[in-house]
């Protein structure tokens, strides 16, 4: 299973805040803390605040955990320029059965101060294998209204095929499919548009012995065009980015190296993750991510602070 470190968690959550997509419904992976001073304590909540280059807050998120380290609530926050503070916006509630995520419910207040449920996602399994993911909107009466679903096929204990369907005005159509391949120690994920013969995107993952991504190759394709200038169902590679990720002893990202090529031109950069101001439990309270690019001055990409609360089992 793919794991996400503390630093990457902060980046993903902040990205979800800036563009609320359906992918943001998956719960953020909890941080990987060092060995706690007491086996009876756990992280109960964590607040992540992002800042601009003037050190003014831009967004925030508060994550609540259960005693198993699973995220049970994600409260998003935005910066109110009039109040000059972070205020709550939408939030998600996560439900589990054992180690498996079974339901996500999304709530939004629309500036009214009164939250209402606006969406939900359910997950169905056979043993440890995810078989179906269903997305719902909420109608005017508060009932679940199906808007699409994903079906997964497994072969030999591995994911093989995913098909995504959308539902509109009672009609169900195939909108996208994915194929999963396993070659040269990599897990390969190919995305296909409906009816396409070749992929529109390809991700190749290599993991370490702890299940963490240490190499990711992302390949983007664009469709071929016929003699009349119309797109066909075949795609050609137009760009490739390879990311090499390193981790510190805590299990958080310490460095990410990128190489990018497109149109015969190549470039590269390196992101360095600096954690500081450890609290009494050994968890960092500050993160700065700096990007170094040959021929350019270093650039600060991310400035975040973390605040934790702890609870006893």
Regions found by a protein language model. Give the residues of each.
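C-terminal motif of bacterial Sec signal peptides marking the signal peptidase cleavage site
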Residues: 16-19
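Buried hydrophobic residues that stabilize the cores of well-folded domains
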Residues: 24-313
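Sec-dependent N-terminal signal peptides
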Residues: 6-14
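Positively charged n-region of N-terminal signal peptides that target proteins for export
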Residues: 1-5
